[in-house]
Every structure is written in C-alpha cells, then in structure tokens.
Design a protein with these regions (language model features):
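Catalytic cores of histone-lysine modification enzymes
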Residues: 2-91
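C-terminal SET catalytic tail plus cysteine-rich post-SET Zn-binding segment of SAM-dependent SET-domain
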Residues: 85-170
C-alpha cells in the first residue's frame, strides 16, 4: 500500500524519549525546509469519533470541522508523520498539511511540533516534552494564548490563523 504522508529522506522514525516513536533528523535540515506532509482522507468531527475509536489518534485538524488522516488500520502507519508534541518545537505548519523546520536542525534531533499549531478541541493532556519552558498541561485551546500566537507566527495551521483573526482581530 502506498504511503499517505511524505517524510523527508533526511529523517528516520525511531523510539522517542518523549513518547512512542518519533521523527529524527539524519542529516542537517535547513530552516523552512519541508520535513513532512500529512496525507490521508478528509473527514468531519462526527466521523472523527468513529475513526479514533477504531484507530486511536492518527489525524491532524485542518479546519474548524475538518481533519485529515487514515480511515483503516492498513492506512494508519503510512499516514503518520511521527511528530511528537513539544512546548519548544523545531518544526511548524505552513498551510494546513505541510510541516517545515522553524530553524536549522542538526542530525540526531527529534522533530517536534506544538499541538497549539494545529489543534482546536476540548482535550487536555499532561505534557512530557521535557522542554525548559514546558507548559506541563497541553490543551486543545492553547492556540488562544497570545504568547503562543506570537511565538509561532508563520508556523500555525491556516485555519487557526483565520480563527485568531476573527476572535482577536489580529
């Protein structure tokens, strides 16, 4: 089965100290270089519940009521980008599905993004990223935090940028 997502040939997937498996640089990655493109099927929040019940979390949010991800167990592995959450990430979002380096990344570094760049939901989780500026608890509403909006300017999902403009006039 063909892969649904693209991972840069400068990366590899291996065990992560953050959680499960992660995406790691095998070669130097330059700022704004594409490191992953999330692929899959487009579905709404109602369908998301059924997909998550069957596959667990394997999607990313691309609109207020739109998600992209696998629909079957066979597609799950090939749709993953293996980017764990970090409160001090080194990759961010351009558009809705393209992940790029926010700075130069050295070989051996784990590629991480902050879920505040992509998620708008009611979830909450204890953070284990280990960053010096770790928020300890990550929520699906963190995108509303002014400090994160400023920190991730240019690296947040398009739909969140639009929501910020509507809600906060930015």
């Amino acid at each position: 089965m063909p892969e649904l997502s693209f991972l840069s040939p400068k990366t590899t997937v291996k065990s992560s100290p953050i959680q499960g498996r992660g995406l790691f640089a095998t070669q130097k990655i330059i700022k704004d270089e594409i490191v992953a493109v999330k692929g899959g099927h487009i579905f709404n929040r109602e369908a998301l519940a059924a997909v998550e019940a069957m596959l667990g979390s394997a999607e990313i949010q691309i609109g207020e009521d739109l998600f992209i991800g696998p629909l079957t167990a066979e597609e799950r592995e090939g749709s993953m980008i293996f980017s764990n959450h970090s409160c001090n990430p080194n990759i961010g979002v351009k558009g809705q599905i393209v992940f790029v380096a926010m700075r130069d990344i050295e070989p051996g570094e784990e590629l991480t993004h902050d879920w505040a760049m992509t998620d708008d939901d009611d979830t909450q989780m204890e953070c284990r990223c280990g960053a010096s500026d770790c928020r300890k608890v990550v929520t699906g509403q963190d995108w509303k935090r002014k400090n994160l909006q400023e920190k991730y300017r240019g690296y947040m999902s398009w739909y969140l940028v639009e929501m910020i403009a509507r809600e906060f006039g930015q």
